[in-house]
């Protein structure tokens, strides 16, 4: 088996692991829109956070796997001689756009929701977030955070973005 095919295998497998890590968070965003009980919201938020919290085993797997996705992608660009083509650079830009959009539209409202119900919350950061102490719960802040959460937009960005990435990787249009 060639180095290139081995890297393709690692890259695709690591993307599948990355998507698997998002399963609970994906479901939670839909369930949260219907929930108004702070204690249940807290449990759902903890479930969602488990996939990304670098203090937990699954969160560490997620962040290490993200490095494998990026590293194998760079390796494929070099091993395949694709770094001179446009499609891999567009793939990088699309991937970064997906990450930033998900952080803004998913991570931001979820962190504000944690804050609004009196849980420790994240002020920012990737991988090593800046955790803040719990504040007094606020029904108004909770409703505001829930109204900002749009699971349909997150789904469109995630599925649509990865469809674009898949198209670029499979068809290498330019």
Each language-model region and where it sits:
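Polytopic transmembrane helical bundles with strong interfacial aromatic enrichment
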Residues: 1-174
């Amino acid at each position: 088996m060639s180095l290139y095919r081995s890297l393709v295998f690692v890259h695709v497998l690591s993307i599948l692991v990355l998507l698997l890590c998002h399963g609970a968070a994906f479901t939670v965003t839909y369930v949260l829109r219907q929930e108004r009980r702070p204690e249940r919201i807290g449990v759902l938020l903890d479930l969602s956070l488990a996939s990304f919290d670098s203090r937990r085993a699954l969160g560490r797997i997620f962040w290490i796997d993200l490095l494998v996705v990026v590293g194998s992608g760079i390796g494929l660009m070099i091993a395949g001689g694709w770094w001179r083509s446009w499609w891999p650079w567009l793939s990088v830009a699309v991937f970064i756009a997906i990450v930033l959009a998900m952080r803004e539209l998913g991570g931001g409202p979820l962190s504000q929701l944690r804050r609004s119900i009196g849980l420790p919350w994240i002020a920012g950061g990737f991988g090593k977030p800046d955790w803040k102490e719990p504040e007094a719960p606020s029904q108004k802040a909770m409703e505001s955070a829930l109204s900002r959460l749009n699971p349909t937009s997150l789904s469109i960005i995630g599925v649509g973005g990865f469809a674009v990435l898949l198209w670029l990787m499979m068809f290498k249009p330019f």
